[in-house]
């Protein structure tokens, strides 16, 4: 088995999230875990002053190296590299509240993250917890990637359960209208290609049915033909499978990924199985892009209570997938 020093570890860029929230705190706490450096070479993007404040809040011992643009990152776990583009010229902001300044800074950091991934400086990226309130004040909400059927998808990961969502924030009535054979076949194909790039040579995909026991018109007339079209391309995909059992099959190792039809179908399964260490993949950009599965937690920022489990999970998973080593076996 190769060691971390023998492997080529990917450089992963993590945007710290809204500077008034717990994002900087969970980032530095996660980086203090040596496992992150086993999987990747991490670089933060955001306010160096906010990161410095987070080190004080959490009691984390590390030295900051501040960069104004991308430079060769340090390989020393005791050093935290931060790319600070000067989006917050006055340093830090008040804690626990939405501000226009925080929204502008968040948007600029997201743009920097995207640019560095597209030019190859970052092999993959992670978005810390953002505030849509701050982004709305700055009129920058468009910087956040919203899952769009046929174009981008939300994938939730928790232990052995991995769930992609055909649709996201959409009413059940709209879901019924949107589901089509072409949409299902497209999503299955995109999942297959993504998982191969993550190191899963022969992905096994299960497609959940829409109706109880997968016995409705939508299952028969749209979902099943979409699965057949994907299977005709050589993809290992099964379904539609009854929604009340398909997630258990994934947990037991029969499948590598489940494609859920709508938001709550997938989210309920994931959050019932596990919550603390969940992470999120946002499929859509031409690179691996992940996020944490929690918000800014304004009510506990600065108290030292912020739990870094989800950020740690995102950083470790991102490193594994970006280097083509697949999902960690649960």
From Swiss-Prot:
A divalent metal cation binds at residues 169, 213, 263. The active site is located at the dimer interface. Binds 1 divalent metal cation per subunit. Can use ions such as Zn(2+), Mg(2+) or Co(2+). Its cofactor is Zn(2+); Mg(2+); Co(2+). It is found in: Cytoplasm. Catalyzes the NAD(P)-dependent oxidation of 4-(phosphooxy)-L-threonine (HTP) into 2-amino-3-oxo-4-(phosphooxy)butyric acid which spontaneously decarboxylates to form 3-amino-2-oxopropyl phosphate (AHAP). Its EC number is 1.1.1.262. One of its GO terms (molecular function) is 4-hydroxythreonine-4-phosphate dehydrogenase activity. This is Putative 4-hydroxythreonine-4-phosphate dehydrogenase. GO terms for cellular component: cytoplasm. Pfam families: PdxA. It catalyses: 4-(phosphooxy)-L-threonine + NAD(+) = 3-amino-2-oxopropyl phosphate + CO2 + NADH. It comes from Novosphingobium aromaticivorans. Its main location: cytoplasm. Belongs to the PdxA family. Homodimer. Keywords: Cobalt, Cytoplasm, Magnesium, Metal-binding, NAD, NADP, Oxidoreductase, Plasmid, Pyridoxine biosynthesis, Zinc. GO terms for biological process: pyridoxine biosynthetic process. Pathway: Cofactor biosynthesis; pyridoxine 5'-phosphate biosynthesis; pyridoxine 5'-phosphate from D-erythrose 4-phosphate: step 4/5.
């Amino acid at each position: 088995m190769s060691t971390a020093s023998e492997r080529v570890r990917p450089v992963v860029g993590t945007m710290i999230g809204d500077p008034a929230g717990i994002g900087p705190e969970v980032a530095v706490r996660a980086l203090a875990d040596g496992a992150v450096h086993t999987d990747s070479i991490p670089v933060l993007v955001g306010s160096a002053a906010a990161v410095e404040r987070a080190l004080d809040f959490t009691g984390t011992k590390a030295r900051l190296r501040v960069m104004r643009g991308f430079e060769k990152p340090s390989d020393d776990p005791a050093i935290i590299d931060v790319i600070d583009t000067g989006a917050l010229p006055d340093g830090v902001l008040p804690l626990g509240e939405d501000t226009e300044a925080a929204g502008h800074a968040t948007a600029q950091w997201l743009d920097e993250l995207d640019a560095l991934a597209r030019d190859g400086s970052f092999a993959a990226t992670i978005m810390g917890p953002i505030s849509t309130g701050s982004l709305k004040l700055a009129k920058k909400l468009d910087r956040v990637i919203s899952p769009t059927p046929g174009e981008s998808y939300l994938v939730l990961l928790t232990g052995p359960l991995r769930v992609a969502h055909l649709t996201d924030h959409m009413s059940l009535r709209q879901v019924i209208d949107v589901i089509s054979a072409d949409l299902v076949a497209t999503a299955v194909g995109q999942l297959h290609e993504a998982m191969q790039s993550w190191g899963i040579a022969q992905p096994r995909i299960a497609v959940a049915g829409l109706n109880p026991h997968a016995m409705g018109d939508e299952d028969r007339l749209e979902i099943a033909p979409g699965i057949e079209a994907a299977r005709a391309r050589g993809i290992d995909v099964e379904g539609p499978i009854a929604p009340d059992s398909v997630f258990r099959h994934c947990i037991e190792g029969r499948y590598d990924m489940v494609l859920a039809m709508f938001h709550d179908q997938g989210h309920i399964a994931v959050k019932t199985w596990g919550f603390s260490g969940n992470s999120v993949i946002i499929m859509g950009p031409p690179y691996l892009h992940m996020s944490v599965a929690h918000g800014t937690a304004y009510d506990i920022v600065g108290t030292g209570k912020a739990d870094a489990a989800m950020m740690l999970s995102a950083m470790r998973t991102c490193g594994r997938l970006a280097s083509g080593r697949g999902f960690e076996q649960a």
